[in-house]
UniProtKB/Swiss-Prot annotation:
UniProt cofactor(s): heme
Protein name: Beta-amyrin 28-monooxygenase
Keywords of the record: Heme, Iron, Membrane, Metal-binding, Monooxygenase, Oxidoreductase, Transmembrane, Transmembrane helix
Gene Ontology CC: membrane
CDD domains reported for this sequence: CYP90-like (cd11043)
Known EC number: 1.14.14.126
Cellular location(s): Membrane
Pfam families linked to this entry: p450
Membrane-spanning segments: 5-25
Annotated source species: Medicago truncatula
Single GO term (MF): heme binding
UniProt feature coiled coil, ranges: none
Record membrane topology: Single-pass membrane protein
Top-level taxon in the UniProt lineage: Eukaryota
Length: 479
């Protein structure tokens, strides 16, 4: 019996070891508890459906259809060639914005890196972005922006006199882009000659079209045109930078007059100054960020005020009270803008319904769990403004235009996110508020209007844009 006993003991030991190894192997190889969802077709994933809902004017459909299907505020998919977790709702916004550089970091598609290549040999686009965010706050904080209000008003007045006055009909979106781009050129690098600014305008539109196109670098493709446009603008910016360096040396330019001067005179922790190509890259990024989203907001302000006369009347009343309180010819100032409370609530409601920034990507820098689901390192995460902006749990009757949502304490935290949030919140948020309010003031003082195409379609690609650029019929106020 003894041999049988030892044989049984050996078999028991082997069985135990085998089961242990199987358990360890199975645990390591078992699938992660990923959020529910489908990855779509090979390579393209669900990118076409993600984009097509925007082209049809309802980008939120991609989000809400899947939230309902999976009964979850997190779902997995594959977009822009990446395994992605789409994070919906205020709790997701809070989690992502609060864990920047802890669990997640900013991420851009490769196409963006190719259109905006960093010129620093030891940095990447993320590191350059971090450096910029350390540089910008002193220019975009309210106390610094106060001195720009009058300049913005001068530029807005000239813009309306030149492009709106004495016109029966105008097309809003191109003019809104012209206004915000001229402001950015003037305030970031003191360029205000419209002919000089116009030289940049068309290439910038090519860049905007190429960023969201397929990254196919062949002659004639939008992506190829965007790369060429980026290179052209860089060369033009370097000419401006070289001249500013001369002007600073000769004392004809001020060290504090704009961001460009500051960049030329700023050195890093090692005492090294930025080279001209590096500065050109940063100014290029600022010019894009400084006018694209604001021009969308201004365009949709015109759209909604044209559709909602009762809202227009309240904005007009507030703006005329401010105008009548000032001596003739006096420019707007900081105190005037602080009085535009209802007007800003209207602007916020516009950005809730038509957020210029539809969402943003992050990349998981480590494995982590969220809401009971595994998020693997390297996966991308996408937050969506529409997941809260058009969610009845966050904003009752979400399709109704109601500026009173922003009275008092306003919306609940992390539900209204037109500028993002956390460390990556748009540093130009206050700057955007100024340019939008100055635009609104000069607009409603001059005109009422109606849409030429009452049911004009909206396209989101990647910003919301009226399909025909919003033509309107102008009715000047009688003197």
């Amino acid at each position: 019996m003894e041999p049988n006993f030892y044989l049984s003991l050996l078999l028991l030991f082997v069985t135990f070891i085998s089961l242990s190894l199987f358990f360890i192997f199975y645990k390591q190889k078992s699938p992660l508890n990923l959020p529910p969802g489908k990855m779509g077709y090979p390579i393209i994933g669900e990118s076409l459906e993600f984009l097509s809902t925007g082209w049809k004017g309802h980008p939120e459909k991609f989000i809400f259809d899947r939230m309902r299907k999976y009964s979850s505020e997190l779902f997995k998919t594959s977009i822009v060639g990446e395994s992605t977790v789409v994070c919906c709702g205020a709790a997701s916004n809070k989690f992502l914005f609060s864990n920047e550089n802890k669990l997640v970091t900013a991420w851009w598609p490769d196409s963006v890196n190719k259109i905006f290549p960093t010129t620093s040999l030891d940095s990447n686009l993320k590191e350059e972005s971090i450096k910029m965010r350390k540089l910008l706050p002193q220019f975009f904080k309210p106390e610094a922006l106060q001195r720009y209000v009058g300049v913005m008003d001068v530029i807005a007045q000239r813009h309306f006199v030149t492009h709106w006055d004495n016109k029966n009909e105008i097309t809003v979106y191109p003019l809104a882009k012209r206004y915000t781009f001229l402001l950015a050129c003037r305030l970031f690098m003191s360029v205000e000659d419209e002919n000089h600014v116009a030289k940049f305008s068309d290439p910038f539109q090519l860049i905007a079209a190429g960023i969201i196109s397929l990254p196919i670098d062949l002659p004639g493709t939008p992506f190829n045109k965007a790369i060429k446009a980026s290179n052209f603008i860089r060369k033009e910016l370097i000419k401006i930078i070289k001249q500013r360096r001369v002007d600073l040396a000769e004392g004809t330019a001020s060290p504090t007059q704009d961001i460009l001067s500051h960049m030329l005179l700023t050195s890093d922790e090692n005492g090294k100054s930025m080279n001209e190509l590096n500065i050109a890259d940063k100014i290029l990024g600022l010019l894009i960020g400084g006018h694209d989203t604001a021009s969308v907001a201004c365009t949709f302000l015109v759209k909604y005020l044209g559709e909602l006369p009762h809202i227009y009347d309240k904005v007009y009343q507030e703006q005329m009270e401010i105008a009548k309180s000032k001596p003739a010819g006096e420019l707007l100032n900081w105190d005037d803008l602080k009085k535009m409370k209802y007007s800003w609530n209207v602007a916020c409601e516009v950005m809730r319904l038509s957020p210029p920034l539809q969402g943003g990507f992050r990349e998981a820098i480590t494995d982590f769990m969220f809401n009971g689901f595994s998020i693997p390192k390297g996966w991308k995460l996408y937050w969506s403004a529409n997941s809260t902006h058009k969610n009845a749990e966050c904003f009752p009757m979400p399709e109704k235009f109601d500026p009173t949502r922003f009275e008092g304490n306003g919306p609940a935290p992390y539900t209204f996110v037109p500028f993002g949030g956390g460390p990556r919140m748009c540093p130009g948020k206050e700057y955007a508020r100024l340019e939008i309010l100055v635009f609104m003031h000069n607009l409603v003082k001059r005109f009422k209007w109606e849409k030429v195409i009452p049911d004009e379609k909206i396209i989101v690609d990647p910003f919301p844009i009226p399909a025909k650029d919003l033509p309107i019929r102008l009715y000047p106020h009688k003197a």
